[in-house]
Structures are given as structure tokens and as C-alpha cells.
């Protein structure tokens, strides 16, 4: 028998979990969505899953643990909840792809280090701001050392649900750590702003990068352009508003050239409105990571009898 699909489940039926459900249905790859689990029987996400014939559960993680065929679990709950979920999933031999800022496993950003942690039991997708800005900081750091990176992420207030609002502190800490650990900056800072404007704005990010020393401007611009193209393979609405700008500025390390990048992320509109690019980039990254984990599992598990 040829095994060609890996069963996966989504834990959390809010905005992120529901958008991820539609992405997995649209581009399943080597994955089969076997269950969507939440805790609110009246949630729109569970109702939509039932309407399209996907099994659902309202007892949270319990139904996932009870099905031994589910190998990969996308956790779209909250950082606090994932602390408990991570332990249970590991104890039951499941792979956790964590869409919360809990950071119980190594950080993963698809175009940067997607293949480095395929034996991990738990990987963390950092934050929406991290998925958006870490690739650009890494694009600089791979061609010249980076002393400092700072990102300011502005998202539509309407795109920030209760889970996002509860995780603000975790967002800033985890994003900054990701800019350092994955982006390659020696030091970093992250800031998020919820903009109540109507109509809602697209996700916008401003990234400041202070290189350690001299660098070739054209090499940096080419590296950034290649990274944008790499991210666009799974987030088509990911785009720079202009070419990177390089300005001489006063910094804590003296007069230095500062690389400034203005980034916009438009969502695909699978479930969430297109202005919610901050959520869309998380679910798109999750699907991308899940796809590689599924392929890796199948490469080890496929048998012919």
C-alpha cells in the first residue's frame, strides 16, 4: 500500500485557524485535513468546517490526541494555551506547528531555514511581523553583518482578534528574538501598532537595518529583491513599496548608513479580508511548513506491501 497523504488537524477555530483551513483545502499538497478542533461550539470556523464536510470537535486538543492517525497539528490558539498543548502533543508523538508566539520549539521562516528542523517535534512560526520582516533582515545579513534591526508593524485594528490582542507582549519579545536568531541581527527591537482607520489598511512594515561596517549597496538590493521573490511564491501579496533606501543617520554607534525598507502585505482573501495580510502571511507560512513536514514524514514512512 502506498501512503501518499499525512493526516493533519487544526487546533483553534478562530480567524487564523479558519483561514488556514481554506488554504489547506485549496492547496493540500501531501496533507489531508482530518479535523478542526475548537472549544466554542458556536464558532464560525467550526460551522464552516461542518458545512464543507470536515470533521470537527469542540473539546479542544482531546479529540486530536484521541486520533492516532493525526501526525501534524497546527496550533492556532494562544501562546498561553500552546504551553500546555506543546507538552501533550510531544507526549503523544505529534508534530506541532505553532502559530502562536509561545516559542516552545525552534523558530522557522520558510525562505530562510525551512529545511533545518524537520526532525523537531515542535516548530514556531514566530509572529506575523516576524514572518514579514525577518526574511528582509536576513537578506541583508547574508551579504553583510548586521549590528541592529528594528521593525514597526502596523496592522488594521479589525484584523486583530482577541488572541492577537492578548499576545502583544509575546509578539514584541518573540519577533525581536526572531530578528536576531533567524534574521541575523546582533540586536533587534519589534513594535506593533493597531490602526483603527476605516476602511482598514493593509499590513505595513517599516524595517530599519544598521550594518556593522561597509557594504555594497547593489549587493544588498539584489539580495533583498531575491528574498521578496522567494516569499511571493507562497504570499503573492508580499511587496516592497519602493527600493530599499540607504541614509546616513545618527545611531547609538555613531553616524552610520541605515537601510530602510517599506513593506506591504496584502492577503489572498481565502477567508479573511485582503487587508488582513498580517494573518494571511501566518497561515500561508504554516501551510508551507506543514507541506515540507508531510513530505519528510512520507519519505520515512512510505512502504510498499
From Swiss-Prot:
NAD(+) binds at residues 13-16, 159-167, 278. It catalyses: acetaldehyde + NAD(+) + CoA = acetyl-CoA + NADH + H(+). Its EC number is 1.2.1.10. One of its GO terms (biological process) is catabolic process. Gene3D superfamilies: Dihydrodipicolinate Reductase, domain 2, NAD(P)-binding Rossmann-like Domain. The keyword NAD applies. GO terms for molecular function: acetaldehyde dehydrogenase (acetylating) activity; NAD binding. The keyword NAD applies. The active site is at residue 128. Keywords: Aromatic hydrocarbons catabolism, NAD, Oxidoreductase. InterPro entries: Acetaldehyde_dehydrogenase (IPR003361), Acetylaldehyde_DH_C (IPR015426), NAD(P)-bd_dom_sf (IPR036291), Semialdehyde_DH_NAD-bd (IPR000534). Pfam families: AcetDehyd-dimer (PF09290), Semialdhyde_dh (PF01118). Coiled coil: none annotated. Transmembrane segments: none annotated. Belongs to the acetaldehyde dehydrogenase family. HAMAP family: Ac_ald_DH_ac. NCBIfam families: ac_ald_DH_ac, PRK08300.1. This is Acetaldehyde dehydrogenase. It comes from Chloroflexus aurantiacus (strain ATCC 29366 / DSM 635 / J-10-fl).
Amino acid at each position: 500500500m502506498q501512503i501518499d497523504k499525512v493526516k493533519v488537524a487544526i487546533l483553534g477555530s478562530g480567524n487564523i485557524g479558519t483561514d488556514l483551513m481554506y488554504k489547506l483545502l485549496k492547496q493540500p499538497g501531501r496533507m489531508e485535513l482530518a479535523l478542526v478542533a475548537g472549544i466554542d461550539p458556536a464558532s464560525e470556523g467550526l460551522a464552516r468546517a461542518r458545512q464543507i464536510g470536515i470533521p470537527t470537535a469542540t473539546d479542544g486538543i482531546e479529540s486530536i490526541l484521541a486520533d492516532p492517525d493525526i501526525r501534524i497539528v497546527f496550533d492556532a490558539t494562544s501562546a498561553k494555551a500552546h504551553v500546555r498543548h506543546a507538552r501533550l502533543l510531544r507526549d503523544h508523538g505529534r508534530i506541532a506547528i505553532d502559530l502562536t508566539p509561545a516559542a516552545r520549539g525552534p523558530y522557522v521562516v520558510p525562505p530562510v531555514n525551512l529545511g533545518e528542523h524537520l526532525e523537531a517535534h515542535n516548530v514556531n512560526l514566530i509572529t506575523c511581523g516576524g514572518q514579514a520582516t525577518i526574511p528582509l533582515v536576513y537578506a541583508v545579513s547574508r551579504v553583510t553583518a548586521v549590528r541592529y534591526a528594528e521593525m514597526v508593524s502596523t496592522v488594521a485594528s479589525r484584523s486583530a482578534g482577541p488572541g492577537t490582542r492578548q499576545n502583544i507582549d509575546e509578539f514584541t519579545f518573540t519577533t525581536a528574538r526572531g530578528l536576531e536568531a533567524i534574521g541575523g541581527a546582533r540586536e533587534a527591537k519589534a513594535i506593533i501598532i493597531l490602526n483603527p482607520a476605516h476602511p482598514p489598511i493593509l499590513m505595513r512594515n517599516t524595517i530599519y537595518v544598521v550594518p556593522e561596517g561597509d557594504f555594497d549597496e547593489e549587493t544588498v538590493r539584489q539580495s533583498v529583491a531575491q528574498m521578496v521573490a522567494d516569499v511571493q511564491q507562497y504570499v503573492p501579496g508580499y511587496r516592497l513599496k519602493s527600493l530599499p533606501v540607504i541614509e546616513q543617520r545618527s545611531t547609538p554607534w555613531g553616524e552610520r548608513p541605515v537601510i530602510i525598507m517599506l513593506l506591504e502585505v496584502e492577503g489572498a482573501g481565502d477567508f479573511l479580508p485582503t487587508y488582513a495580510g498580517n494573518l494571511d502571511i501566518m497561515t500561508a507560512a504554516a501551510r508551507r511548513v506543514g507541506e515540507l513536514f508531510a513530505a519528510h514524514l512520507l519519505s520515512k514512512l512510505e512502504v510498499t506491501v
